[in-house]
Amino acid sequence: MSNKKNDRRTQILQALAQMLESSPGARITTAALAKQVGVSEAALYRHFPSKAKMFEGLIEFIEESLFTRINRIVQEESNVIARIEMIVTLVLGFAEQNPGMCRLLTADALAGETERLRVRITQVFDRIETQLKQVIREADLKQGLRPAMGVAPCANFLIAIIEGKIRHYVRSEFKVKPMEIWPEQWTVLAQNLMLNR
Protein backbone atom coordinates (compact mmCIF):
# COMPACT_ATOMS: atom_id res chain seq x y z
CA MET A 1 0.00 0.00 0.00
CA SER A 2 2.79 2.44 0.93
CA ASN A 3 4.62 1.83 -2.37
CA LYS A 4 1.42 2.50 -4.31
CA LYS A 5 0.95 5.76 -2.38
CA ASN A 6 4.57 6.78 -3.03
CA ASP A 7 4.17 5.91 -6.72
CA ARG A 8 1.08 8.13 -6.93
CA ARG A 9 2.89 10.96 -5.12
CA THR A 10 5.77 10.64 -7.58
CA GLN A 11 3.33 10.59 -10.49
CA ILE A 12 1.67 13.78 -9.20
CA LEU A 13 5.02 15.55 -8.80
CA GLN A 14 6.18 14.46 -12.26
CA ALA A 15 2.93 15.72 -13.79
CA LEU A 16 3.31 19.03 -11.95
CA ALA A 17 6.90 19.43 -13.21
CA GLN A 18 5.79 18.59 -16.75
CA MET A 19 2.98 21.16 -16.57
CA LEU A 20 5.41 23.80 -15.32
CA GLU A 21 7.57 23.07 -18.36
CA SER A 22 4.82 22.90 -20.97
CA SER A 23 2.87 25.95 -19.77
CA PRO A 24 5.41 28.74 -19.20
CA GLY A 25 3.83 31.67 -17.42
CA ALA A 26 0.59 29.81 -16.71
CA ARG A 27 -0.77 29.29 -13.24
CA ILE A 28 -1.18 25.60 -12.41
CA THR A 29 -4.53 24.75 -10.86
CA THR A 30 -5.26 21.59 -8.91
CA ALA A 31 -8.14 20.88 -11.32
CA ALA A 32 -5.75 20.94 -14.30
CA LEU A 33 -3.18 18.87 -12.40
CA ALA A 34 -5.81 16.28 -11.43
CA LYS A 35 -6.87 16.04 -15.08
CA GLN A 36 -3.23 15.61 -16.17
CA VAL A 37 -2.70 12.81 -13.63
CA GLY A 38 -6.07 11.23 -14.40
CA VAL A 39 -7.46 11.43 -10.88
CA SER A 40 -9.94 13.60 -9.00
CA GLU A 41 -8.89 16.70 -7.07
CA ALA A 42 -9.87 14.81 -3.91
CA ALA A 43 -7.36 12.10 -4.86
CA LEU A 44 -4.63 14.75 -5.16
CA TYR A 45 -5.45 15.96 -1.66
CA ARG A 46 -5.19 12.42 -0.28
CA HIS A 47 -1.51 12.52 -1.22
CA PHE A 48 -0.77 16.21 -0.58
CA PRO A 49 -2.77 18.38 1.86
CA SER A 50 -2.28 21.46 -0.35
CA LYS A 51 -0.82 22.66 -3.62
CA ALA A 52 1.93 24.32 -1.58
CA LYS A 53 2.96 20.86 -0.32
CA MET A 54 3.17 19.66 -3.93
CA PHE A 55 5.53 22.53 -4.74
CA GLU A 56 7.50 21.72 -1.58
CA GLY A 57 7.86 18.16 -2.86
CA LEU A 58 9.48 19.50 -6.03
CA ILE A 59 11.71 21.86 -4.04
CA GLU A 60 12.84 18.91 -1.90
CA PHE A 61 13.71 17.04 -5.10
CA ILE A 62 15.78 20.04 -6.26
CA GLU A 63 17.59 20.25 -2.91
CA GLU A 64 18.30 16.54 -2.73
CA SER A 65 19.50 16.37 -6.34
CA LEU A 66 21.81 19.37 -6.08
CA PHE A 67 23.22 19.15 -2.58
CA THR A 68 23.95 15.42 -2.65
CA ARG A 69 26.07 16.00 -5.76
CA ILE A 70 27.63 19.24 -4.50
CA ASN A 71 28.77 17.43 -1.35
CA ARG A 72 30.27 14.67 -3.49
CA ILE A 73 32.14 17.24 -5.63
CA VAL A 74 33.57 18.91 -2.51
CA GLN A 75 34.70 15.56 -1.09
CA GLU A 76 36.14 14.08 -4.28
CA GLU A 77 37.66 17.03 -6.19
CA SER A 78 40.75 18.63 -4.68
CA ASN A 79 41.37 21.38 -7.26
CA VAL A 80 39.43 24.46 -6.19
CA ILE A 81 38.93 25.94 -9.66
CA ALA A 82 37.63 22.56 -10.86
CA ARG A 83 35.29 22.41 -7.85
CA ILE A 84 33.83 25.82 -8.66
CA GLU A 85 33.37 24.87 -12.30
CA MET A 86 31.77 21.55 -11.38
CA ILE A 87 29.33 23.13 -8.91
CA VAL A 88 28.21 25.86 -11.32
CA THR A 89 28.03 23.37 -14.20
CA LEU A 90 26.02 20.97 -12.04
CA VAL A 91 23.39 23.61 -11.24
CA LEU A 92 23.17 24.81 -14.85
CA GLY A 93 23.00 21.23 -16.14
CA PHE A 94 20.29 20.34 -13.63
CA ALA A 95 18.32 23.39 -14.76
CA GLU A 96 18.68 22.47 -18.42
CA GLN A 97 17.55 18.89 -17.80
CA ASN A 98 14.59 19.99 -15.64
CA PRO A 99 12.98 23.01 -17.34
CA GLY A 100 9.83 22.82 -15.21
CA MET A 101 11.94 23.10 -12.06
CA CYS A 102 13.43 26.33 -13.43
CA ARG A 103 10.04 27.99 -13.06
CA LEU A 104 10.31 27.16 -9.37
CA LEU A 105 13.95 28.26 -9.12
CA THR A 106 13.03 31.66 -10.56
CA ALA A 107 9.87 31.75 -8.39
CA ASP A 108 7.93 32.35 -11.63
CA ALA A 109 5.49 29.55 -10.81
CA LEU A 110 5.11 30.70 -7.21
CA ALA A 111 3.25 33.96 -7.92
CA GLY A 112 0.20 33.96 -5.68
CA GLU A 113 1.46 31.01 -3.65
CA THR A 114 2.49 31.03 -0.01
CA GLU A 115 5.55 33.09 0.99
CA ARG A 116 7.06 29.98 2.58
CA LEU A 117 7.77 28.56 -0.89
CA ARG A 118 9.65 31.65 -2.06
CA VAL A 119 11.69 31.53 1.15
CA ARG A 120 12.61 27.88 0.42
CA ILE A 121 13.81 28.81 -3.08
CA THR A 122 15.86 31.69 -1.65
CA GLN A 123 17.41 29.22 0.79
CA VAL A 124 18.42 26.90 -2.07
CA PHE A 125 20.45 29.69 -3.69
CA ASP A 126 21.79 30.84 -0.31
CA ARG A 127 23.07 27.32 0.37
CA ILE A 128 24.76 27.13 -3.02
CA GLU A 129 26.36 30.54 -2.42
CA THR A 130 27.55 29.45 1.03
CA GLN A 131 29.09 26.33 -0.48
CA LEU A 132 30.86 28.43 -3.12
CA LYS A 133 32.20 30.77 -0.41
CA GLN A 134 33.63 27.79 1.45
CA VAL A 135 35.30 26.47 -1.70
CA ILE A 136 36.71 29.91 -2.53
CA ARG A 137 38.11 30.29 1.01
CA GLU A 138 39.84 26.92 0.64
CA ALA A 139 41.57 28.16 -2.53
CA ASP A 140 43.86 30.34 -0.43
CA LEU A 141 44.56 27.67 2.17
CA LYS A 142 45.12 24.74 -0.17
CA GLN A 143 46.35 26.25 -3.42
CA GLY A 144 47.66 29.72 -2.60
CA LEU A 145 44.97 31.39 -4.70
CA ARG A 146 42.83 34.35 -3.70
CA PRO A 147 39.66 35.54 -5.40
CA ALA A 148 40.09 38.56 -7.67
CA MET A 149 37.32 40.41 -5.83
CA GLY A 150 37.01 38.97 -2.31
CA VAL A 151 35.26 35.80 -1.16
CA ALA A 152 31.69 37.11 -0.75
CA PRO A 153 31.65 39.19 -3.96
CA CYS A 154 33.13 36.27 -5.92
CA ALA A 155 30.53 33.78 -4.65
CA ASN A 156 27.76 36.33 -5.24
CA PHE A 157 29.01 36.91 -8.79
CA LEU A 158 28.84 33.16 -9.49
CA ILE A 159 25.31 32.94 -8.06
CA ALA A 160 24.27 35.91 -10.21
CA ILE A 161 25.55 34.06 -13.27
CA ILE A 162 23.64 30.91 -12.29
CA GLU A 163 20.41 32.77 -11.58
CA GLY A 164 20.75 34.90 -14.71
CA LYS A 165 21.24 31.91 -16.98
CA ILE A 166 18.28 30.07 -15.40
CA ARG A 167 16.07 33.17 -15.68
CA HIS A 168 17.12 33.59 -19.33
CA TYR A 169 16.18 29.94 -19.94
CA VAL A 170 12.70 30.52 -18.50
CA ARG A 171 12.24 33.85 -20.30
CA SER A 172 13.16 32.22 -23.65
CA GLU A 173 10.52 29.54 -22.96
CA PHE A 174 13.34 26.99 -22.61
CA LYS A 175 14.94 27.70 -25.99
CA VAL A 176 18.20 29.31 -24.77
CA LYS A 177 19.79 26.51 -22.77
CA PRO A 178 21.94 27.38 -19.72
CA MET A 179 24.80 25.11 -20.88
CA GLU A 180 24.73 26.26 -24.51
CA ILE A 181 27.77 28.58 -24.39
CA TRP A 182 28.83 27.93 -20.80
CA PRO A 183 32.16 26.22 -21.66
CA GLU A 184 33.40 29.33 -23.51
CA GLN A 185 32.10 31.60 -20.77
CA TRP A 186 33.78 29.49 -18.08
CA THR A 187 37.12 29.63 -19.91
CA VAL A 188 37.13 33.43 -19.70
CA LEU A 189 35.73 33.50 -16.18
CA ALA A 190 38.21 30.94 -14.81
CA GLN A 191 41.16 32.97 -16.09
CA ASN A 192 40.01 36.00 -14.11
CA LEU A 193 38.35 34.51 -11.03
CA MET A 194 41.38 33.70 -8.88
CA LEU A 195 44.82 35.27 -8.50
CA ASN A 196 48.06 33.77 -7.22
CA ARG A 197 49.21 34.96 -3.79
Swiss-Prot record:
DNA-binding region: 29-48
Coiled-coil parts of chain: none
Keyword flag Flavoprotein: no
Domain of life: Bacteria
One term of GO molecular function: sequence-specific DNA binding
Family: Belongs to the nucleoid occlusion factor SlmA family.
The protein's name: Nucleoid occlusion factor SlmA
Lineage of the species this protein comes from: Bacteria, Pseudomonadati, Pseudomonadota, Gammaproteobacteria, Oceanospirillales
Gene: slmA
